[in-house]
Each structure stands twice: as C-alpha cells, then as structure tokens.
Amino acid sequence: NVVGCMIGGGPGTYPLTCDPKDVLLVQEKLQEGIYYTADVMAKGAYPYFAPRIWKKYGVNLDITPEDVVDLQQGTVDMITYSYYSTSCATTHPVTETAGGNLNMGPKNPYLTYNEWGWSLDPDGLRYSLNEYYARYHLPLMVVENGLGASDTLEADGTVHDPYRIAYVKAHVQAMEA
C-alpha cells in the first residue's frame, strides 16, 4: 500500500526583486504556507522553523514522546499536489497585482496572465517538481492542473480551445524537461 498526501500548491512564489528582503520574505512564505505541513507529512517531524510559526500565531503545543514516534512512523510515501500558477512577493510598494486566485500578489512582469489574472507559468511547474523532489526524495504526482477560461459552446456542443491545449502541452513539456 502507498499513502500520499495532498498539498494545495507548489513552492511557486518568486521574489519580485533580487532584494535580499524579498528573498527572505519568499522563504518565510514557503516555510509557513507549504513546508510546515509538508515536512511533517513527508519527514515525520516538525521543521526547525515551526516554533517561530507557533509563536507568531500564539500556538502552544504539548508534544509528547508518543506524538514524536507517531509522526516519525506516519510519513507519506508520495507527494501529490495541485499546480495552477505562481505568484510573487515583495517588501516594496506594489503597482500592479495579479488577481483571480488565492495567490494574489505583485504581478510578475515576465509572465502572461489569463483573463482572470492567473499567471501562465509552465516553468513554475518544473520548478515546483524540482523543489519538492530535492526536499523530500519521494515520488511526485501533480493531481490538478488546468486553465480556466470563458469558453464558447458551439452549436454542435463542442468547445474550440486551442489556448487550453497549448497550456496543457506546455505544462506536460515542462514535466518532461
């Protein structure tokens, strides 16, 4: 039997600038939003930065020796996650934001966006695969990936969506890279 987990996204947040404060902000966002839970599931222990997060949110855990053993013995065999788009983070004033999803933040000037403000970033998928594998050395499965768009239903019931086909093709090619 193989046990997996579901992570709501990949480590797809880029610093908007090369300012070290932006780099550190992204690192903190990934630790809090992705790695905190993924590390527990895949490594069987709370990460070194967990106490900082607990303090930030006023959490006081009473972790028993039995809890430690349970975590160590309850790790997953594979990582599964959703990937739709990437985001940016910055400590600087933002003039243009991306919208339409939970990853709202500064708009990445190197990416294109769909009509709802989701970034189109197949390289971000490749990056997330690389990061997850480097961190966990476990099989990976992208279980959600797609493109939302306003489609036109033709009279014969078909939808002509070459833009969606191009999106899927680019993301499959990124996985093969």
What are these regions (language model features)?
Residues 1-177:
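Active-site region of glycoside hydrolase catalytic domains
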